[in-house]
Amino acid sequence: MKILHIITSLELGGAERLLTELVPYQKSKGHFVKVMILSDRGAVFKKELEDRGIEIVVAKSNSIKSFSNIFSIVNEIKKENYDIVHAHLVHAQYWTRLAKLLDDKKRKYITTEHSTSNRRRDSKLMRGIDKFIFSGFDKIVSISEATQKSLQEWLERDDNSFEIIYNGIDIKEFQLSEPYDKNELGIKEDDYLVMMVSRFHQSKNQLGVAEALMWLPVKYKLVFVGDGKLEDDVKKYCQKNNLMSRVKFLGMRKDIPRLLKTADIVVQYSFFEGFGITAIEAMASGKPVIASNVPGLSQVVEGAGILVGAKDSKELAKGILSLRNEELYKEISEKCLERSKKYTIKWCANNYLELYERELKC
Protein backbone atom coordinates (compact mmCIF):
# COMPACT_ATOMS: atom_id res chain seq x y z
CA MET A 1 0.00 0.00 0.00
CA LYS A 2 0.96 3.63 -0.51
CA ILE A 3 0.03 5.59 2.61
CA LEU A 4 0.15 9.35 3.27
CA HIS A 5 -0.27 10.61 6.83
CA ILE A 6 -1.19 14.31 7.04
CA ILE A 7 -0.86 16.03 10.41
CA THR A 8 -0.99 19.66 11.48
CA SER A 9 2.57 19.64 12.87
CA LEU A 10 5.08 17.47 14.69
CA GLU A 11 5.11 19.43 17.95
CA LEU A 12 5.09 17.68 21.33
CA GLY A 13 1.74 15.93 21.64
CA GLY A 14 0.04 12.57 21.79
CA ALA A 15 -1.01 12.41 18.13
CA GLU A 16 2.44 13.47 17.00
CA ARG A 17 4.12 10.96 19.30
CA LEU A 18 1.88 8.20 17.95
CA LEU A 19 2.99 8.92 14.39
CA THR A 20 6.67 8.59 15.32
CA GLU A 21 5.98 4.94 16.17
CA LEU A 22 3.12 4.12 13.81
CA VAL A 23 4.71 5.27 10.56
CA PRO A 24 8.09 3.46 10.90
CA TYR A 25 6.23 0.26 11.81
CA GLN A 26 4.03 0.55 8.73
CA LYS A 27 7.10 1.11 6.58
CA SER A 28 8.83 -1.92 8.15
CA LYS A 29 5.94 -4.05 6.84
CA GLY A 30 6.86 -3.14 3.28
CA HIS A 31 4.47 -0.26 2.69
CA PHE A 32 5.34 3.07 1.07
CA VAL A 33 4.65 5.67 3.77
CA LYS A 34 5.24 9.43 3.92
CA VAL A 35 4.22 12.15 6.37
CA MET A 36 3.00 15.59 5.34
CA ILE A 37 2.93 18.44 7.87
CA LEU A 38 1.31 21.83 7.41
CA SER A 39 3.95 23.59 9.50
CA ASP A 40 7.38 22.59 10.77
CA ARG A 41 7.27 25.09 13.65
CA GLY A 42 8.44 23.36 16.83
CA ALA A 43 8.59 20.05 14.97
CA VAL A 44 10.39 18.15 17.71
CA PHE A 45 9.59 14.77 16.14
CA LYS A 46 10.58 15.67 12.56
CA LYS A 47 14.23 14.68 12.86
CA GLU A 48 13.34 11.51 14.76
CA LEU A 49 11.15 10.36 11.88
CA GLU A 50 13.73 11.35 9.28
CA ASP A 51 16.44 9.47 11.19
CA ARG A 52 14.21 6.41 10.95
CA GLY A 53 14.00 6.72 7.17
CA ILE A 54 10.66 8.51 6.87
CA GLU A 55 10.30 11.27 4.29
CA ILE A 56 8.62 14.41 5.66
CA VAL A 57 6.87 16.79 3.26
CA VAL A 58 6.15 20.32 4.51
CA ALA A 59 3.24 22.19 2.92
CA LYS A 60 4.46 25.00 0.68
CA SER A 61 2.86 27.68 2.88
CA ASN A 62 4.44 26.29 6.07
CA SER A 63 1.33 27.60 7.81
CA ILE A 64 -1.54 25.66 9.37
CA LYS A 65 -4.12 28.26 8.26
CA SER A 66 -3.18 28.89 4.62
CA PHE A 67 -5.81 28.13 1.99
CA SER A 68 -2.99 26.99 -0.29
CA ASN A 69 -2.62 23.88 1.86
CA ILE A 70 -5.44 22.37 -0.19
CA PHE A 71 -3.28 22.48 -3.31
CA SER A 72 -0.15 21.26 -1.51
CA ILE A 73 -2.12 18.23 -0.34
CA VAL A 74 -3.68 17.57 -3.76
CA ASN A 75 -0.30 17.83 -5.48
CA GLU A 76 1.31 15.36 -3.06
CA ILE A 77 -1.58 12.91 -3.32
CA LYS A 78 -1.51 12.91 -7.13
CA LYS A 79 2.29 12.86 -7.31
CA GLU A 80 2.58 9.53 -5.47
CA ASN A 81 -0.92 8.19 -6.26
CA TYR A 82 -1.59 7.06 -2.68
CA ASP A 83 -4.05 4.33 -1.80
CA ILE A 84 -4.67 5.70 1.71
CA VAL A 85 -4.76 9.32 2.88
CA HIS A 86 -4.88 9.51 6.68
CA ALA A 87 -5.47 12.88 8.41
CA HIS A 88 -4.71 13.70 12.05
CA LEU A 89 -5.74 16.82 14.05
CA VAL A 90 -8.15 19.56 13.12
CA HIS A 91 -6.28 21.68 10.55
CA ALA A 92 -5.10 18.61 8.67
CA GLN A 93 -8.65 17.23 8.77
CA TYR A 94 -10.13 20.42 7.33
CA TRP A 95 -7.63 20.92 4.51
CA THR A 96 -7.60 17.23 3.62
CA ARG A 97 -11.40 17.15 3.37
CA LEU A 98 -11.35 20.15 1.02
CA ALA A 99 -8.50 18.65 -1.00
CA LYS A 100 -10.61 15.54 -1.53
CA LEU A 101 -13.08 17.66 -3.50
CA LEU A 102 -10.33 18.12 -6.11
CA ASP A 103 -9.31 14.46 -6.15
CA ASP A 104 -10.72 12.53 -9.11
CA LYS A 105 -9.56 9.09 -7.94
CA LYS A 106 -11.47 6.80 -5.57
CA ARG A 107 -8.77 6.36 -2.96
CA LYS A 108 -9.61 5.91 0.73
CA TYR A 109 -9.63 8.83 3.16
CA ILE A 110 -9.22 8.04 6.87
CA THR A 111 -9.06 10.32 9.90
CA THR A 112 -8.23 9.76 13.54
CA GLU A 113 -9.88 11.82 16.27
CA HIS A 114 -7.42 12.30 19.13
CA SER A 115 -9.40 14.26 21.76
CA THR A 116 -12.70 14.19 23.62
CA SER A 117 -13.19 17.96 23.48
CA ASN A 118 -12.20 21.15 21.67
CA ARG A 119 -13.28 24.78 21.41
CA ARG A 120 -15.21 24.18 18.17
CA ARG A 121 -17.83 22.30 20.13
CA ASP A 122 -18.88 25.51 21.86
CA SER A 123 -20.33 26.80 18.56
CA LYS A 124 -23.50 25.64 16.81
CA LEU A 125 -22.09 26.97 13.54
CA MET A 126 -19.02 24.77 13.88
CA ARG A 127 -21.24 21.70 14.30
CA GLY A 128 -22.49 22.14 10.74
CA ILE A 129 -18.97 22.67 9.44
CA ASP A 130 -17.65 19.61 11.28
CA LYS A 131 -20.51 17.50 9.94
CA PHE A 132 -19.40 18.42 6.44
CA ILE A 133 -15.71 17.82 7.19
CA PHE A 134 -16.18 14.38 8.73
CA SER A 135 -18.66 13.32 6.03
CA GLY A 136 -15.74 13.23 3.61
CA PHE A 137 -13.83 10.46 5.40
CA ASP A 138 -14.47 6.81 4.65
CA LYS A 139 -13.51 5.80 8.18
CA ILE A 140 -13.38 7.82 11.40
CA VAL A 141 -11.08 6.27 13.99
CA SER A 142 -11.20 7.30 17.65
CA ILE A 143 -8.44 6.52 20.14
CA SER A 144 -10.82 5.57 22.96
CA GLU A 145 -14.48 4.85 23.69
CA ALA A 146 -14.83 8.27 25.31
CA THR A 147 -13.39 9.99 22.23
CA GLN A 148 -15.78 8.18 19.92
CA LYS A 149 -18.82 8.83 22.10
CA SER A 150 -18.16 12.57 22.35
CA LEU A 151 -17.54 12.83 18.59
CA GLN A 152 -20.68 10.89 17.70
CA GLU A 153 -22.75 13.12 19.97
CA TRP A 154 -21.21 16.21 18.40
CA LEU A 155 -21.79 15.01 14.82
CA GLU A 156 -25.18 13.51 15.70
CA ARG A 157 -24.14 10.33 13.90
CA ASP A 158 -23.78 6.69 14.84
CA ASP A 159 -22.99 4.47 11.87
CA ASN A 160 -20.44 1.91 10.71
CA SER A 161 -17.95 4.56 9.60
CA PHE A 162 -16.74 4.81 13.22
CA GLU A 163 -14.06 2.56 14.69
CA ILE A 164 -11.89 2.53 17.83
CA ILE A 165 -8.15 1.81 17.76
CA TYR A 166 -6.22 2.51 20.95
CA ASN A 167 -2.88 4.28 20.76
CA GLY A 168 0.26 2.21 21.26
CA ILE A 169 3.91 2.73 22.16
CA ASP A 170 7.22 0.88 21.88
CA ILE A 171 7.11 -0.64 25.36
CA LYS A 172 10.76 -1.74 25.37
CA GLU A 173 12.02 1.76 24.59
CA PHE A 174 10.66 2.93 27.94
CA GLN A 175 11.36 -0.22 29.93
CA LEU A 176 15.03 -0.35 28.95
CA SER A 177 15.94 3.35 29.12
CA GLU A 178 18.56 4.42 31.66
CA PRO A 179 17.55 7.15 34.12
CA TYR A 180 19.56 10.32 34.64
CA ASP A 181 21.07 11.14 37.99
CA LYS A 182 18.65 13.65 39.47
CA ASN A 183 21.45 16.14 39.95
CA GLU A 184 21.81 16.26 36.16
CA LEU A 185 18.40 17.93 36.19
CA GLY A 186 19.39 20.27 39.01
CA ILE A 187 17.62 18.24 41.69
CA LYS A 188 19.10 16.57 44.77
CA GLU A 189 19.20 12.77 44.70
CA ASP A 190 17.11 12.50 47.89
CA ASP A 191 14.42 14.88 46.61
CA TYR A 192 11.10 13.48 45.42
CA LEU A 193 10.72 14.19 41.70
CA VAL A 194 7.21 14.72 40.30
CA MET A 195 7.14 15.05 36.50
CA MET A 196 4.64 16.20 33.90
CA VAL A 197 5.29 15.80 30.17
CA SER A 198 3.02 17.91 27.96
CA ARG A 199 2.82 21.05 25.89
CA PHE A 200 1.69 24.08 27.90
CA HIS A 201 -1.96 24.40 26.92
CA GLN A 202 -5.04 25.36 28.91
CA SER A 203 -6.43 21.83 28.61
CA LYS A 204 -3.29 20.27 30.12
CA ASN A 205 -3.57 22.20 33.42
CA GLN A 206 0.07 22.62 34.42
CA LEU A 207 -1.09 25.46 36.65
CA GLY A 208 -3.12 23.00 38.72
CA VAL A 209 -0.03 20.84 39.19
CA ALA A 210 1.98 23.86 40.34
CA GLU A 211 -0.82 24.70 42.79
CA ALA A 212 -0.58 21.18 44.23
CA LEU A 213 3.07 21.82 45.03
CA MET A 214 1.90 24.39 47.60
CA TRP A 215 0.47 21.51 49.66
CA LEU A 216 3.60 19.37 49.48
CA PRO A 217 6.77 19.35 51.64
CA VAL A 218 9.82 21.20 50.29
CA LYS A 219 11.55 17.90 49.42
CA TYR A 220 9.03 17.49 46.60
CA LYS A 221 10.28 18.98 43.34
CA LEU A 222 8.33 19.44 40.12
CA VAL A 223 9.69 19.06 36.58
CA PHE A 224 7.74 20.25 33.53
CA VAL A 225 8.76 18.90 30.13
CA GLY A 226 7.37 20.73 27.10
CA ASP A 227 6.70 24.30 26.01
CA GLY A 228 3.78 26.39 24.81
CA LYS A 229 1.94 29.68 25.08
CA LEU A 230 0.98 29.25 28.74
CA GLU A 231 4.45 28.42 30.02
CA ASP A 232 5.06 32.03 31.08
CA ASP A 233 1.78 32.06 33.04
CA VAL A 234 2.89 29.02 35.04
CA LYS A 235 6.31 30.58 35.65
CA LYS A 236 4.68 33.79 36.91
CA TYR A 237 2.53 31.77 39.31
CA CYS A 238 5.61 29.94 40.61
CA GLN A 239 7.51 33.21 41.04
CA LYS A 240 4.59 34.86 42.85
CA ASN A 241 4.30 31.92 45.26
CA ASN A 242 8.05 31.41 45.82
CA LEU A 243 8.08 28.03 44.08
CA MET A 244 10.77 28.62 41.45
CA SER A 245 13.45 26.90 43.55
CA ARG A 246 11.29 23.76 43.51
CA VAL A 247 10.23 23.77 39.85
CA LYS A 248 12.27 23.02 36.72
CA PHE A 249 11.12 23.93 33.20
CA LEU A 250 13.03 21.72 30.76
CA GLY A 251 11.32 22.85 27.56
CA MET A 252 11.05 20.57 24.54
CA ARG A 253 13.08 17.39 24.95
CA LYS A 254 13.73 14.34 22.79
CA ASP A 255 14.90 12.14 25.68
CA ILE A 256 11.44 11.48 27.13
CA PRO A 257 12.12 7.80 27.99
CA ARG A 258 15.17 8.72 30.10
CA LEU A 259 13.36 11.60 31.78
CA LEU A 260 10.40 9.41 32.72
CA LYS A 261 12.77 6.82 34.14
CA THR A 262 14.27 9.54 36.35
CA ALA A 263 10.93 10.61 37.84
CA ASP A 264 9.50 9.21 41.06
CA ILE A 265 5.90 10.00 40.07
CA VAL A 266 4.40 11.06 36.75
CA VAL A 267 1.32 13.29 36.68
CA GLN A 268 -1.12 13.86 33.82
CA TYR A 269 -3.63 16.39 35.12
CA SER A 270 -5.59 17.37 31.99
CA PHE A 271 -9.08 18.85 31.98
CA PHE A 272 -9.83 16.57 29.03
CA GLU A 273 -7.85 13.96 27.14
CA GLY A 274 -8.61 11.63 24.25
CA PHE A 275 -6.41 8.85 25.52
CA GLY A 276 -3.29 9.73 27.51
CA ILE A 277 -0.28 8.33 25.67
CA THR A 278 2.12 9.99 28.13
CA ALA A 279 0.45 8.04 30.93
CA ILE A 280 1.15 4.80 29.05
CA GLU A 281 4.78 5.82 28.48
CA ALA A 282 5.19 6.53 32.19
CA MET A 283 3.60 3.20 33.08
CA ALA A 284 5.96 1.38 30.71
CA SER A 285 8.81 3.14 32.53
CA GLY A 286 7.65 1.44 35.73
CA LYS A 287 6.47 4.68 37.34
CA PRO A 288 3.24 5.25 39.27
CA VAL A 289 0.87 7.54 37.40
CA ILE A 290 -1.54 10.02 38.97
CA ALA A 291 -4.10 11.37 36.52
CA SER A 292 -7.24 13.46 36.44
CA ASN A 293 -10.46 11.47 36.44
CA VAL A 294 -11.70 12.52 33.00
CA PRO A 295 -13.00 10.40 30.09
CA GLY A 296 -10.28 8.89 27.92
CA LEU A 297 -7.56 9.29 30.50
CA SER A 298 -9.49 7.47 33.21
CA GLN A 299 -9.95 4.50 30.87
CA VAL A 300 -6.18 4.11 30.66
CA VAL A 301 -5.36 4.71 34.34
CA GLU A 302 -8.29 3.28 36.32
CA GLY A 303 -7.39 0.12 38.20
CA ALA A 304 -3.66 0.73 37.81
CA GLY A 305 -2.68 4.29 38.75
CA ILE A 306 -4.39 6.88 40.95
CA LEU A 307 -7.26 9.06 39.71
CA VAL A 308 -8.03 12.46 41.26
CA GLY A 309 -10.43 15.32 40.57
CA ALA A 310 -9.39 17.44 37.60
CA LYS A 311 -10.06 20.71 39.43
CA ASP A 312 -8.84 19.88 42.93
CA SER A 313 -5.12 20.53 43.38
CA LYS A 314 -5.35 19.61 47.07
CA GLU A 315 -6.65 16.15 46.11
CA LEU A 316 -3.77 15.84 43.65
CA ALA A 317 -1.32 16.67 46.44
CA LYS A 318 -2.92 14.02 48.67
CA GLY A 319 -2.53 11.47 45.89
CA ILE A 320 1.14 12.33 45.55
CA LEU A 321 1.68 12.14 49.31
CA SER A 322 -0.06 8.76 49.52
CA LEU A 323 2.80 7.26 47.53
CA ARG A 324 5.21 7.89 50.42
CA ASN A 325 3.94 4.50 51.56
CA GLU A 326 6.55 2.17 50.07
CA GLU A 327 4.19 -0.79 49.75
CA LEU A 328 1.57 1.30 47.95
CA TYR A 329 4.25 2.84 45.72
CA LYS A 330 5.48 -0.63 44.71
CA GLU A 331 1.95 -1.93 44.16
CA ILE A 332 0.89 1.00 41.97
CA SER A 333 4.15 0.92 39.98
CA GLU A 334 3.73 -2.80 39.23
CA LYS A 335 0.09 -2.37 38.22
CA CYS A 336 1.02 0.51 35.93
CA LEU A 337 3.80 -1.50 34.28
CA GLU A 338 1.42 -4.40 33.67
CA ARG A 339 -1.27 -2.07 32.28
CA SER A 340 1.15 -0.59 29.73
CA LYS A 341 1.57 -4.00 28.09
CA LYS A 342 -1.96 -3.71 26.68
CA TYR A 343 -0.98 -0.78 24.50
CA THR A 344 1.81 -1.87 22.16
CA ILE A 345 2.60 -0.10 18.90
CA LYS A 346 2.58 -3.49 17.14
CA TRP A 347 -1.07 -4.06 18.10
CA CYS A 348 -2.03 -0.49 17.21
CA ALA A 349 -0.23 -0.42 13.84
CA ASN A 350 -1.53 -3.81 12.76
CA ASN A 351 -5.08 -2.68 13.51
CA TYR A 352 -4.60 0.35 11.27
CA LEU A 353 -3.14 -1.78 8.46
CA GLU A 354 -6.06 -4.20 8.71
CA LEU A 355 -8.45 -1.24 8.58
CA TYR A 356 -6.76 0.11 5.44
CA GLU A 357 -6.94 -3.29 3.74
CA ARG A 358 -10.63 -3.69 4.56
CA GLU A 359 -11.42 -0.25 3.21
CA LEU A 360 -9.54 -0.85 -0.04
CA LYS A 361 -11.65 -3.95 -0.64
CA CYS A 362 -14.90 -2.00 -0.30
Language-model segments: residues:
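Short hydrophobic beta-strand element within catalytic cores of glycosyltransferases
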Residues: I37, P288-A291
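Acidic anion/phosphate-binding donor-loop and adjacent secondary structure
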Residues: I64-S68, K149-E153, D159-S161, Y166-E184
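Short His-centered aromatic/hydrophobic patch
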Residues: A87-W95, E113
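Conserved acidic donor-binding segment of nucleotide-sugar-dependent glycosyltransferases
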Residues: A291, G303-S313, S322-E327
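Aromatic "clamp/platform" in nucleotide-sugar-dependent glycosyltransferases that forms part
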Residues: M252, F271
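A short, well-ordered alpha-helix in the C-terminal region of glycosyltransferases
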Residues: L328-K342, N351-E354
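N-terminal strand-loop element at the rim of the active site
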Residues: H5-S68, L155, K229-L230
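A conserved mid-protein helix/loop that constitutes part of the nucleotide-sugar donor-binding site
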Residues: G13-P24, Y192-W215, K229-K236, I280, ...
